[in-house]
């Protein structure tokens, strides 16, 4: 689908918006431990991979795309923020198509962060139960090609999107749902 978008719109009209909570902090931590104990970074350490823009820059370079390239790190909403921005870029006429989505890997850094927030479940995840007691972490990736019109027969429609902040709590929205309603 990326190649179809390139053929239809050209490389300068395709953007990239990708999100990630943790951009390689685990690898950076290991590399810095090696530096302080052994006096040098491991030979396979790539400082560029630690940059906040790494995932979007990587995809842009892989496909030689010349459109806007943005990365998002807004915790759990990183991928959603990327998809929303992609939609806005298309609606504004900045891009004709945008590669959007996100990727996250399991890492001790993220696990410890959620554990310090007391957000990790003590048992199997039960998100829709009134007895839920937290989340279970995983890893994954999902990438979409959003475009101003159909590229192929597998096209879907993004019917709407929104973002808001209820300024309540990092992991617990207002119980009345007003933050979600505002979005």
Regions found by a protein language model. Give the residues of each.
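Acidic, glycine-rich active-site loops and adjacent beta-strand->loop/helix elements
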Residues: 20-23, 74-78, 103-107, 162-166
């Amino acid at each position: 689908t990326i190649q179809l978008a390139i053929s239809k719109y050209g490389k300068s009209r395709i953007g990239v918006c990708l999100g990630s909570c943790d951009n390689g902090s685990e690898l950076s931590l290991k590399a810095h431990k090696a530096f302080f104990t052994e006096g040098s970074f491991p030979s396979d350490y790539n400082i560029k991979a630690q940059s906040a823009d790494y995932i979007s820059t990587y995809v842009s370079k892989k496909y030689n795309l010349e459109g806007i390239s943005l990365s998002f790190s807004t915790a759990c909403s990183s991928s959603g923020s990327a998809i929303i921005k992609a939609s806005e870029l298309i609606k504004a006429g900045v891009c004709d198509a945008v590669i959007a989505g996100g990727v996250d890997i399991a890492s001790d850094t993220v696990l410890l962060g959620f554990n310090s927030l007391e957000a990790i479940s003590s048992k199997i995840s039960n998100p829709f139960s009134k007895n839920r007691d937290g989340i279970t972490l995983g890893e994954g990736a999902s990438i979409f090609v959003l475009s101003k019109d159909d590229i192929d027969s597998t096209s879907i429609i993004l019917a709407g999107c929104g973002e808001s902040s209820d300024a309540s709590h990092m992991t617990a929205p207002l119980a009345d749902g007003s933050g979600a309603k505002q979005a």
